[in-house]
């Protein structure tokens, strides 16, 4: 393999609030600007720009080091990107005005920064102050709330190609002063940039948060915004043992349901190909997708096997949303929908594969045992049940994603939770399944697979 002509490492490490750092100085924005300029000049096969941790020159950042020659740069800005790419990366001439030439001075500055950092750590420990990482975890909700509020206001779409705070406030029907404060907070998170009083979306925000972008994640993230309200009841839920706002999916508003299904569709679309590869679609003629939501998994299985027919069972509020995705995928002749309640309605029979994805965490133990038993009855001999969910390890303390998601079910459902591998195994064994196994997958969810005896 041929290495890149230049490997450019740019620090974007964020230090505790108030401490000088490359992250606070705009390191991420510099990285994005360099990557854009490298692409614009057609040098992507010759230059690799990589984010890295501290280079030890925190008070002079953003800092970068360019290999193979080991050229150091400090105090970089967005405006420096075109010159760096043109002069250094294209023409091989380091930019003298930005270059750190005195090796002894650089080493002394690194040592001074290290000593200052260690002294600050010792002082904090002696004072009994919270460790920085713990303090940041406790306060992390502030960043989430800023982003979620911006998404609820569709602020990034309104910013578009750029706008002043007063104009943006008028378009979102909000207070000008408060809107400007929100924009400044977003700028501190490097999701927008402010230049000459005009706010612009960062490349990340433009890609994932704006209407018209093919990667727009806002519709699904509005479901995350709605979770803010339920998670705010966690203390009450822990005291009472159940959610404070009990509502089933069919009882929610249409806006909530659309946001929820949009979020589930985005997640499923990302996970569908790995799931199909892990389970296998060949030899499957009839598939049941229990609570299939948007239909993303059925669509993926149908695409992988032209002889497969899938049947999605879901609520009346969800089925029209699934039909829209099915029609867009061009598989309406082989992916069918049926309105029904997975808790009570007949599942059918003779299926080669039954998929239960993101369902078991909404149910209690008895409901899961009952559903898994009914899935066994719906399968043809030799057919397989695949459960995809947040699966806890036996001690229920890990993985972290499943442990936290269990609380999401506490605050959002009457009796849902994340369940452990031994619990799934026991339910499947009691139903009659054999060859039961857990399959670890990329991302937070895993699989439990069992076979009905031939």
Language-model segments: residues:
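Local cysteine-cluster metal-coordination motifs and their immediate loop/turn environment
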Residues: 5-25, 48-67
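Small/polar loops that bind or transfer phosphate-bearing groups
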Residues: 16, 73, 314
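General structural feature for long, well-ordered alpha-helical segments within catalytic domains
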Residues: 26, 30, 77-80, 84, ...
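Ferredoxin-type iron-sulfur electron-transfer modules in oxidoreductases and energy-metabolism complexes
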Residues: 27-49, 71, 75-90
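Structural motif
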Residues: 66-68, 194-195
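Fe-S ferredoxin-like electron-transfer domains
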Residues: 71, 75-124
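Conserved Class I S-adenosyl-L-methionine-dependent methyltransferase catalytic core
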Residues: 124-164, 170-173, 177-285
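Alpha-helical subdomain
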Residues: 124-184, 188, 194, 281, ...
């Amino acid at each position: 393999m041929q290495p890149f002509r230049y490997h450019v490492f740019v620090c974007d490490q964020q230090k505790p609030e108030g401490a000088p750092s490359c992250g606070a100085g705009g390191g991420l924005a510099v990285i994005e600007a360099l990557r854009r300029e490298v692409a614009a000049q057609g040098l992507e096969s010759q230059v690799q720009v990589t984010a890295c941790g501290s280079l030890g020159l925190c008070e002079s950042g953003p800092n970068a080091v360019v290999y193979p020659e080991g050229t150091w740069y400090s105090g970089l800005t967005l405006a420096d990107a075109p010159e760096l790419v043109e002069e250094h990366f294209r023409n091989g001439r380091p930019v003298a005005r930005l270059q750190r030439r005195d090796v002894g001075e650089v080493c002394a500055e690194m040592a001074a920064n290290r000593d200052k950092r260690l002294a600050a750590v010792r002082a904090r420990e002696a004072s009994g102050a919270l460790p920085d990482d713990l303090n940041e975890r406790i306060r992390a909700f502030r960043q989430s709330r800023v982003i979620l509020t911006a998404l609820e206001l569709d602020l990034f779409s309104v910013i578009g190609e750029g706008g002043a705070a007063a104009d943006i406030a008028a378009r979102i029907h909000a207070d000008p002063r408060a809107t400007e404060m929100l924009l400044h907070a977003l700028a501190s998170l490097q999701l927008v940039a402010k230049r000459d009083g005009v706010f612009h979306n960062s490349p990340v925000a433009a890609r994932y948060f704006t209407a018209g972008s093919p990667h727009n994640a806002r519709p699904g993230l509005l479901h995350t915004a709605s979770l803010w309200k339920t998670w705010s009841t966690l203390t009450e839920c822990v005291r009472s043992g159940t959610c404070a706002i009990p509502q089933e999916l069919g009882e929610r508003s249409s806006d909530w349901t659309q946001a929820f299904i949009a979020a589930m569709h985005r997640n499923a679309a990302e996970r569908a190909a790995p799931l199909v590869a892990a389970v296998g679609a060949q030899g499957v003629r009839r598939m049941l997708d229990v609570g299939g939501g948007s239909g993303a998994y059925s669509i993926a299985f149908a695409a992988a096997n032209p002889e497969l027919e899938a049947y999605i069972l879901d609520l009346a509020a969800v089925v029209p949303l699934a039909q829209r995705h099915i029609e867009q995928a061009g598989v309406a002749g082989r992916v069918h929908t049926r309105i029904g309640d997975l808790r009570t309605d007949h599942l059918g029979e003779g299926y080669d594969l039954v998929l239960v994805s993101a369902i078991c965490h909404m149910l209690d133990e008895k409901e899961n045992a009952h559903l898994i038993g009914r899935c066994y009855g719906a399968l043809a001999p030799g057919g397989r049940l695949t459960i995809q969910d947040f699966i806890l390890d036996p001690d229920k303390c890990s993985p972290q994603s499943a442990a936290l998601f269990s609380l999401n079910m506490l605050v959002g459902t009457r009796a849902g939770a994340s369940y452990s591998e031994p619990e799934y195994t026991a339910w499947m064994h009691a139903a009659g399944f054999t060859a039961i196994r857990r399959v670890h997958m990329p991302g937070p969810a895993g699989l439990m697979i069992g076979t009905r005896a031939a």
